Amino acid sequence: MHAFAPEFGRVAKSYKWPIAKGQTSNLRLLMHRFLRRISIRILSFALAVGCLSATSYGQATSAVIAVDHGPNAQQQLSKHYVILVSLDGFRYDYAKRYHADHLLTLAAQGANAPEGMLPAYPSITFPNHYTIVTGLYPEHHGIVANTFYDPARKEEYSNRDAKSVGDGTWYGGTPLWVLAEQQGMRSACFFWVGSEADIQEVRPSYYLKFDGKFPNGKRVDQVLAWLHLSPEQRPHLITLYFSDADTAGHQYGPDSSQVADAVHELDGEIGRLMDGIKETKLPVDLIVLADHGMVKVEGAAIRLDQYGLNPSWFAQIVDSILYPKSDDDAQRAYEALRGKSDKFLVYRRAQVPGYLHFDSNPREGDPVVVPTGPYLITASGDSRGAEHPPVGMHGYDATRMPEMKALFVAAGPDIRSGVAMMPFENVNVYPLIAKILGLDITNLKTGPIDGKLGVLEGILKSD
């Protein structure tokens, strides 16, 4: 309740007891106003942390963690709202292919990328979610894989490890919620990579620790509950995450009935969200996108140790990311793998093609192995997935495999209607959202971003 303590302590006028007869009506009015103010603050707090039902859509959740950043600054109260929704693994063509009516309606009402949005390399979940909210390529923000090793720290980061996920020192860049909070604007994250961490000593005003079993409907309920907070407490930036399409794609492949079912389930939740937004009558821009696509895996897993790779050359191996003990060992590994198969390319890290933006961060390993097709590559038979590879996979170069391209649709008061965009890189989403929210990104503490506003500025309505 810290956010509301100043309100409780505010005194409009002092009275001495006993109260004179003429003062009674004034005191009653003041007490009425004071109690009403307290009630509104308590209601706002209850909705924020999930104690009460906000709308007819259901209950908010008690799992929300509220951080006391104070109310929205005065200059932020008139700003519009952005809800950023990620459908993990939702390939660019799923909506049309599986008749996701609500997403297709959203696309028709606003802007969309019919041929998809290009994920950063590697096209996997943690790097791309964090790229979307920082405007930086993975090698610049540091989250280069779901699991990786940092040679300087001599530590491993893993999306399966709560300690590293919540450690803000792993994360570079300035995430959108940090940007918002630093400029006096409240934010909320219903799951997003980095949102549990103390990045630049800042967390969202409202966030949750990841729980993959959390019901989708309750996620939407909580987002709508946030929109029903008082203007002072209401977040202007909200993120929302769903994993269903990715899970089904891995287990059954992108052509399966299970993926179709997941698409329909998610589309239903998007429809509920659209209806709920409309009911609020707030100026909300809804952006629904994905981190990457999905492709069916071909053949058995490719083991690099069968091509002469010697584990003794490495200080650490994480899946197929190789961390050599020395530069000489990196060169030995490169020479052992070079030209051995047409199913992968191998580069010394500094020689990785520039368009991949994967050539300067020690966390990326050295040498770097890049698949040429939908193959699962592991360092050895002990690597995760070597024995029983998934049916569907991602992580590949989107310029080689268009199946890696992701969904992007956006609609709302700031988005032009009927706009179809050519494929664009997802680093450009960050400056678009900052522009809609009126947030300044010209002098970030972490330096300039990789994304460019000019790429997507054309989908915005003229001021």
Question: What do the predicted segments below correspond to?
Answer:
Residues 317-435:
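Active-site neighborhoods of enzymes that stabilize oxyanions during catalysis
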Residues 76-77, 216-228, 245-286, 433:
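A long, amphipathic alpha-helix that forms part
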Residues 32-43:
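Bacterial N-terminal signal peptides that target proteins for export
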Residues 136-253, 342:
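His/Asp/Glu-rich, glycine-adjacent segments
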Residues 59-79, 92-182, 198-199:
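Active-site nucleophile/metal-coordination loop of metallo-enzymes that catalyze phosphate/sulfate
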Residues 84, 102, 265-303:
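Metal-dependent active-site segment of extracytoplasmic phospho-/sulfohydrolases and closely related
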Residues 41-54:
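Bacterial N-terminal signal peptides
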